[in-house]
Each structure stands twice: as structure tokens, then as C-alpha cells.
Regions:
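Core segments of alpha-helical transmembrane spans in multipass integral membrane proteins
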Residues: 52-76
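Membrane interfacial helix motifs at helix-loop boundaries and amphipathic/re-entrant anchors
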Residues: 31-58, 113-142
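Loop-to-transmembrane helix junctions at the membrane interface
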Residues: 72-103
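Cytosolic juxtamembrane helix at the C-terminal end of the final transmembrane segment
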Residues: 73-83, 150-174
Length: 174
């Protein structure tokens, strides 16, 4: 069984969930990079520099946010790395990690609900793909994103349970 890099008290399932998050976001990012590179992955190519910057920024930001999930199972999620000015070496208050993680998961659940509604109600203008091969590639790259919200949720809950005192009392500053 492969070794997953995580703190010793992190349950294996939580470490696997946290490590899976950057992997489930990667295919969609690669699809967007292919789109910007001009590969025939969509019906319409990216036409302007502004569109290219937007698509690439979306890719970088989504992957960076996905990588932050690793903080829920790594030492830097409990103690701020020393190289960070002013905060280095301080303990991370558990709720300072859990609240943004659960807010992000909630936003992702909402986003997928909205996308599902738009698709089911046929509200989207035009089609993203021209050919069946493009559609299969698009689905293969974007369907893994459906796992992001549940994986982030269970990772955040495991982090909270691990960092919460036995009496269950936890404040934002603890």
C-alpha cells in the first residue's frame, strides 16, 4: 500500500481525501490550458488575450485552492511555516482552517447545483463542444470536479475532529 504523506494522527481516509483534491481538479485545468493553447478541445477557441488570461487565472487559482486542502493533513495546516513574515511559527486556530474549507465546499456544492440547473433547463447559450470526441474529453476532464466538494468536506471535518479538544469546546482563537 502506498504511503501517504500526512501527520501521524491523521486517519488514512482523511489523508487520501485531502490528497485526492488536487488530483480531481487537475484534468479540468489541463483542459483549460489545452483550450488556451489552441488545441481543438472546444467548439470555440479562446480569441483574446483577456480571455486567455482569465482561463489561465481560473486554472491557477483553482489548483492553488485545491492544494490548500493538503494543509488539513500536513504540519503547515497546524503551525504557520516560519518563513511567513509576522505569522511564522504560530499555531493555526482550527476554525481559521475549517470555516474557509467548509465555506469553499458549500460554494462548490452550490456551483454544481447551479450548473446542473442551467444544463437541465437548457439555459446555456450554444454548445461548448462540436464533436462527440470533444464532449467525451470535456466530461472526462470536468466530471472529476464533482468529487471536490465532498472530499474537501470530509477533510475539513476530519481536521476539526482531530484538532477539537475532548470537551468539544473550541473557539476561533484557540
Amino acid at each position: 500500500m502506498p504511503r501517504i504523506n500526512a501527520l501521524p494522527d491523521v486517519p488514512r481516509w482523511a489523508a487520501l481525501a485531502a490528497h485526492a483534491v488536487p488530483l480531481v481538479t487537475l484534468p479540468s485545468g489541463l483542459w483549460r490550458i489545452a483550450l488556451v493553447a489552441g488545441l481543438p478541445v472546444a467548439a470555440e477557441p479562446v480569441r483574446t488575450v483577456g480571455e486567455s488570461l482569465y482561463v489561465l487565472s481560473l486554472t491557477v487559482v483553482s489548483e492553488a485552492l485545491a492544494l490548500l486542502t493538503l494543509g488539513l493533513v500536513q504540519p503547515w495546516g497546524e503551525t504557520v511555516p516560519r518563513w511567513i513574515p509576522l505569522l511564522g511559527g504560530r499555531n493555526v486556530p482550527p476554525l481559521a482552517a475549517v470555516i474557509p474549507a467548509l465555506a469553499g465546499a458549500t460554494a462548490l456544492f452550490g456551483l454544481w447545483g447551479w450548473v446542473g440547473y442551467v444544463m437541465a433547463a437548457n439555459l446555456a447559450a450554444g454548445s461548448v463542444t462540436d464533436t462527440p470526441a470533444q464532449l467525451v474529453l470535456l466530461l472526462a476532464c470536468y466530471l472529476p470536479l464533482l468529487a471536490w466538494a465532498p472530499l474537501l468536506t470530509v477533510s475539513a471535518i476530519a481536521y476539526y475532529r482531530r484538532r477539537t479538544p475532548a470537551n468539544g469546546m473550541l473557539t476561533f482563537m484557540s
